[in-house]
């Protein structure tokens, strides 16, 4: 697979900068959502997949594993009030 570096604006207004495969985010990149949230990490077929960090526009931060755009696997959520939740995330929620 030959990826190229590029910058694209998605249909929802989000802006992606990084590796592209056939015009789709694939590899390492940065996705800035229209609300100001920012994901930096791995992409497969246009979705966050692998390891990455999402900083929400309101300040909470999730860092860990992703599967098909959802927090799945080992991760850590740090909330703006300083509370930290670490464990195994399943479909976006900390299971243990």
What residue ranges belong to the model's regions?
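Glycine/tyrosine- and acidic-biased, solvent-exposed loop/turn segments at the edges of beta-strands
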Residues: 1-96
